[in-house]
């Protein structure tokens, strides 16, 4: 009877651990997408700064706009491709809650849907003039940067909590098996 109880408990630990591993996958993929976007933000800011120069020619502006649009398109691809098990935390998702122990405790991954919203906002920005580009830097770019930084901080902390809990459960399982 005691052995049967222990086997049941070990199977329950395995089920909780599997849920944590799935959540870690979702979180790590979203974190990678947000990090990729963060890496692109420096290049996007540079293009916006170049576009805010009133002394460039129409041909130069068109080349810079094409570069800017390509960078923003890549950022949008990071949002869409940050999917694990059909879940994309960076757009159109809800928070993910997963069991963290046998006492019904949970850990959460917070949906970061504003990342997708802000990327779409900057993608739709009008940058036909130097003044437009300066406005985009002050508004849309600032918003994207804030949202991505917040997503990196939140997702990083939540994935760390999932990692710590998984390690803890592994140690408990090892001690009882």
Predicted features, each with a name:
Residues 3-177:
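Amphipathic alpha-helical coiled-coil/heptad-repeat segments
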């Amino acid at each position: 009877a005691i052995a049967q109880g222990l086997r049941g408990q070990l199977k329950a630990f395995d089920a909780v651990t599997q849920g944590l591993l799935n959540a870690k996958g979702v979180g790590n993929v979203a974190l990678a997408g947000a990090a990729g976007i963060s890496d692109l933000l420096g290049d996007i800011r540079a293009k916006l700064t170049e576009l805010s120069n009133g002394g460039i020619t129409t041909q130069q502006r068109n080349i810079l706009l094409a570069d800017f649009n390509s960078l923003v398109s890549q950022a949008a691809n990071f949002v869409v491709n940050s999917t694990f098990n059909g879940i994309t935390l960076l757009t159109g998702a809800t928070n993910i809650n997963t069991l963290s122990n046998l006492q019904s405790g949970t850990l959460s991954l917070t949906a970061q849907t504003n990342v997708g919203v802000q990327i779409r906002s900057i993608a739709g920005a009008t940058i036909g003039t130097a003044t437009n580009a300066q406005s985009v830097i002050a508004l849309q770019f600032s918003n994207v940067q804030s949202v991505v930084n917040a997503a990196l901080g939140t997702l990083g902390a939540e994935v760390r909590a999932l990692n710590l809990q998984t390690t803890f459960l592994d140690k408990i399982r090892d001690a009882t098996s």
